[in-house]
Amino acid sequence: MIKFTLQWAVLLGMVMLNTLESKAQNSNYMYRIAKIKVDSSQLENYKLALQEQMNTAIQLEPGVLSYTVVADKKDPSAITIFEVYANQEAYQSHITTPHFKKYKETVKNMVTSLELIDTDLLARVHQKEY
């Protein structure tokens, strides 16, 4: 329970920093949390594959708006990714791209569990640049 609470506290802290935006302003955005457990012996390889996929998606897909990735300090193989897409269609397009398919194929034997959580934005605050 403590680990779960810590992960949520970290995510909330990352998205709540300075300027409040209402849900209505971003009503089409898709916010997803991916909770991933990685085989600890494969963690470095996993991080490389994830970084490559994220960089490519951000460069090539205008509908992929943001990735924030955190690891549990007590269990670095417990990874949480906060993903933001322009809309559901952008996400559906994303998961059909060659770079996403390459990522999934590369990490299929590294990931021991995956939970995807679709969320609704309640509030978002941030510094203009951080």
Task: Describe each region flagged by the PLM.
Residues 52, 56-66, 84-118:
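An amphipathic, aromatic/His-enriched active-site/gating alpha helix that lines ligand/cofactor pockets
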Residues 39-42, 75, 87:
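Acidic/polar helix N-cap motif
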Residues 78:
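Short glycine-/small-residue motifs
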Residues 30-60:
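N-terminal targeting signals for Sec/Tat export/insertion, comprising classic cleavable signal peptides
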Residues 4-8, 16-30, 68-75, 104-130:
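Glycine-rich beta-strand-turn "strand-cap" elements at beta-sheet edges
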